[in-house]
Amino acid sequence: MKTDIEIAQAADIQPITKIAEKIGLSFDDIELYGKYKAKIPLEVLDKFDQQSEGKLVLVTSINPTPAGEGKSTVTVGLADAFARQGKNVMVALREPSLGPVMGIKGGAAGGGFAQVLPMEDINLHFTGDIHAITTANNAISAFLDNSLHQGNPLNIDPRRIIWKRVVDLNDRALRHVTVGLGGPLNGVPREDGFDITVVSEIMAVLCLATSISDLKERLGKIVLAQSYDRKPVTLGDLGVQGAIAMLLKDALKPNLVQTIEGTPALIHGGPFANIAHGCNSVLATKTALKLSDIVITEAGFGADLGGEKFLDIKTRQLGKQPDAVVIVATLRALKMHGGLDKKELTKENVEAVKKGFANLERHIKNMQSYGLPVIVAINEFASDTKSEISALKDLTEALGVPVSLTQVFAKGGEGGLDLAEKLSGMLQEKSDFSYLYDLKEPLSAKIDKVVTEIYGGSKVNYSPKAKRQMREIEENGWNDLPVCMAKTQYSFSDQPNLLAAPEGFEVTVRELLPKIGAGFIVALLGDVMTMPGLPKNPASLKMDVTDDGKISGLF
């Protein structure tokens, strides 16, 4: 079979104006970024404000292997399957971060015959949104350091600055740096550090904002540091939220592209799900809901991370809950949860599938606990055997949950027709949605509920630093915000090697970070890194460009 990039380059890509026409947008309604990409201006969205919203399908997954389980692939393939059935459908995805693309993933725009196009552009610089976020974030750092240099009128304590610089790369050498060296003319020396751009609160703000005015209001609330008298210092105190919003003006507009089969796709925003909230922008999802009858969207990593945050954070801003949830499962991941070594995952082992099923079962029950209908999509790999597939189907159906074998990687939309057919019936059902926690509950109670009811843990411990931060959050009146858990994606716990469905474990909250602009509190569990490093053999070693500009090696 051809590689992803070979399939993408051979695809018959349509002018983006043709794709826009499918969803009722004229040439004047879009801003072209070349022939195959466009942005949708916010004023165009206002035209559809009174239009009824379509059905919303959330695609999530079990706890993944390092290679991922194909959520984006299934999301794209499912949308194409609905389109083949004559449905008015759109897909809404996150934009890939360049760091993981160059590092381990080698591309994140779907796979096989279920991809979004133009694949190379989407995986690289796309329409420049992430670069705009990088610039906005680092402009804040520049204004902050300038305030220190110019007499420190805000009385900022340089030892208590929590705002970091960012770059959209995996670069471990930048995790801890010192700035302001070289004498009085070069600023105030202090410790600093870099995060990867998609971890920036600016990314979360962009993804949760609903208008330019909302964007400015959220930016003004971002907490940058503490003063010497331990009061929060915000971007609003610096007085540059208007300038930062100006830098993000175009990045706020959703990006329109297409799938291999010509289904309209909105790709906008890309926060990580193990650190941030892991969902594409509210504006893109709202736009898709107004312009189509069915919207397929995904949330990063497993249902314990992106799935939980989609339901407890994003839906509160979106004003709509999913009408159904698809949980993507792979036999290789289930065998990993069943105790097999990574080298053994391509070999048949039905017993390991049965043992690892505990992971999928917990994710199913978690999503059902929100009152949502659930279907399992088995994302087929070439190494899967009939016996393993049969065992997984039997186990899933024994729970009373529908299941579908999807072959969208190899067959595109055709390989998702069964999933689309089963979902069509489910979308007619009424869900009885309820949130995991009430926003008025204490922050500690919200964290307890996520850990005990979603993860299966027994106790939450807090570091001395986290206890102090909890008191500060209460004193500042931030207690009624949702919690955004930051932990490993590989396990329900905060320990990446504790696989399947562990119970009775304890987790430790080491830090609580106020993301007031985004509108949530981040609870850092375990050893989550906000700036990834590159592997020994990064995916970029296989990437190249020919003399005539043709790219290779983006998986």
UniProtKB/Swiss-Prot annotation:
Main EC class the enzyme belongs to: ligase
- This protein's record includes keyword Transmembrane helix: no
Q: Does the keyword Protein biosynthesis apply?
A: no
Which reactions does this protein catalyse? (6S)-5,6,7,8-tetrahydrofolate + formate + ATP = (6R)-10-formyltetrahydrofolate + ADP + phosphate
In which pathway does this enzyme or protein participate?
A: One-carbon metabolism; tetrahydrofolate interconversion
Q: What is its EC number?
A: 6.3.4.3
Keywords per UniProt: ATP-binding, Ligase, Nucleotide-binding, One-carbon metabolism
UniProt GO BP: tetrahydrofolate interconversion
What InterPro entries does the database record attribute to this sequence? Formate_THF_ligase, Formate_THF_ligase_CS, P-loop_NTPase
Pfam annotation, one family: FTHFS
* A molecular-function term among this protein's GO annotations: ATP binding
Q: Which residues are involved in binding ATP?
A: T65, P66, A67, G68, E69, G70, K71, S72
Family membership noted in the UniProt record:
Belongs to the formate--tetrahydrofolate ligase family.
Q: Which HAMAP family does this UniProt record tie to the protein?
A: FTHFS (MF_01543)
Name under which the protein is recorded: Formate--tetrahydrofolate ligase
